[in-house]
Amino acid sequence: AMPMLRL
């Protein structure tokens, strides 16, 4: 899975 952590 690909965590969507876009900061």
UniProtKB/Swiss-Prot annotation:
Keywords: Amidation, Hormone. One of its GO terms (molecular function) is hormone activity. The modification Leucine amide is found at L7. This peptide exhibits both potentiating (contraction) and inhibitory (relaxation) effects on the anterior byssus retractor muscle. This is Catch-relaxing peptide. It comes from Mytilus edulis. The lineage of its organism: Eukaryota, Metazoa, Spiralia, Lophotrochozoa, Mollusca.
